[in-house]
Amino acid sequence: MRKPYTLVEILVAVSIIGILTATGLGITGYVRNKVAETQTKTTIKLIEMAFQKYNEKTGSYPVTEDKNGSDLTPFLAIEIPKDWTVNDLKWITAFNDVTLPQSTSTNPTASGLKIRGIRLEETNGSANHRKYYFLDGWGRKLICLNPGIFNSSTSYDLISFGGDKLAGDGSTKKSIRDCENEQQDIFKSQTFYPDEIGDDVTNFTRN
């Protein structure tokens, strides 16, 4: 007959299970962050390509302001009026694979914008508009500063605060919440992006 397990044996087994569980969760979290990072880099590259295509046709970069009342937030967004025409959406059509929303008598508000490879968040907007935010790999709103501050190659900055939701290593005390509450000049006092160890994803080389 097998002897019952001792208390020490039970504690050792529980400890091993706990260690394995913690290790597994850590690996899972790491993998999720890497997937989100890759998705964000892809999104930024697709946006850059579309912006460049638009610039070659018009000589300027598109206006991508997100209006929150009378304020401007730094999030990359587009508002589509229900009576839109293709000419109103020139910079969106600069993307290679776009499904544009249709406005019909049964669906009076333009909705359903899809861009292959990019996550979008659709909001109700207003009675006459539908707003879409561009999301990073973590499902958070992508930041676009236009005119930009940090990118010497283009006149705009694309920024994701990464998994920690903080700008850079957190030393600037800027977060996604700050972006929600502040105007577009959130980085106005900055001359360089203070990030060497942060998990942010940007379209410029950080110092």
Label the model's feature ranges.
Residues 1-31, 40:
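N-terminal single-pass transmembrane signal-anchor helix
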